[in-house]
Amino acid sequence: MKLYSLSVFYKGEPKAVLLKAAYDVSSFSFFQRSSVQEFMTFTSQLIVERSAKGSRASVKEQEYLCHVYVRSDSLAGVVIADSEYPSRVAFTLLEKVLDEFSKQVDRIDWPVGSPATIHYTALDGHLSRYQNPREADPMSKVQAELDETKIILHNTMESLLERGEKLDDLVSKSEVLGTQSKAFYKTARKQNSCCAIM
C-alpha cells in the first residue's frame, strides 16, 4: 500500500487552481520522477475540474486510484494511491487536510493562490504519516486486530478437534448440553448451511 500524491486545489470556473501539493515519487527511477510528478498534478487537476462540488469519487487509472473530495465551498483535495490503499482511509485523510487547510489559509487567498504563495506546511507530514493506513487510522488498526483475532479463534477451535472429529458429533454425544440446546444447535447449523449454499 502506497500513497504517491496529496494535493489541495481551488475548484474555479473553468480551471482548478493548485494551492499546495506533496509527492512521494521515491519508488520511481530518478529520471522518471519529475515526469511522474507532473503527470500526477495534471491528473489531479483534471479530476477536480470534472468533479461536481460537494462530491467524493475514486477514479481508477491503471494500477492507481485517484480519490477526490470537492467541498461545496470549492476547496478540493486529491490523493493518488495504489489500488490496495483503503478508500475509507484516503477520504479520512482528505477530509482532515481540507478542514485543517481551510482553518489555516484565508479563504480570499484560495482563488489566486499558488504553491509558492500559500503557507501551509502540513501536507508532507500527512503524506508520510498516512503511508501506513493501519498506524494512521485507528479504525484500520482495530479492523486488522479483529481479523487476526478471528484467525486465532478459528485455528484454536480447529486444533481442539481431534483428527476426523466433527463438532456435530461432539454436540450429539455431549452429556452437558440439554435436549433443547442440541435442537437449537442443529437448527442453527441447518439455517447457516442453507444460507451458505445460496
Curated annotation (Swiss-Prot):
EC number(s) per entry: 2.3.1.-
Modifications made to the protein after synthesis: Palmitoylated; catalyzes its own palmitoylation. Palmitoylation is required for Golgi targeting. Farnesylation is required for Golgi targeting.
Lipid tethering residues (S-palmitoyl cysteine): 194
Matches recorded under SMART domains: Longin (SM01270)
InterPro entries: Longin-like_dom_sf, Longin_dom, R-SNARE_YKT6, V_SNARE_CC
Compartments (UniProt record): Cytoplasm, Cytosol; Cytoplasmic vesicle membrane; Golgi apparatus membrane
Site features described as (Microbial infection) Cleavage, chain residue numbers: 173-174
Tissue distribution of the protein: Highly expressed by neurons in brain and faintly detected in spleen, lung and kidney (at protein level). Ubiquitously expressed.
UniProt-reported outcome of changing residue 8 to D: Mistargeted to Golgi and plasma membrane. Normally targeted to vesicular structures
SUPFAM superfamilies associated with the record: SNARE fusion complex (SSF58038), SNARE-like (SSF64356)
Keywords: Coiled coil, Cytoplasm, Cytoplasmic vesicle, ER-Golgi transport, Golgi apparatus, Lipoprotein, Membrane, Methylation, Palmitate, Phosphoprotein, Prenylation, Protein transport, Transferase, Transport
GO annotation, cellular component aspect: apical dendrite; basal dendrite; cytoplasm; cytoplasmic vesicle membrane; cytosol; endoplasmic reticulum; endosome; Golgi apparatus
Binding partners and assembly: Identified in 2 different SNARE complexes; the first one composed of GOSR1, GOSR2 and STX5 and the second one composed of BET1L, GOSR1 and STX5.
Function comment: Vesicular soluble NSF attachment protein receptor (v-SNARE) mediating vesicle docking and fusion to a specific acceptor cellular compartment. Functions in endoplasmic reticulum to Golgi transport; as part of a SNARE complex composed of GOSR1, GOSR2 and STX5. Functions in early/recycling endosome to TGN transport; as part of a SNARE complex composed of BET1L, GOSR1 and STX5. Has a S-palmitoyl transferase activity.
Family of this protein: Belongs to the synaptobrevin family.
Protein name: Synaptobrevin homolog YKT6
Gene: Ykt6
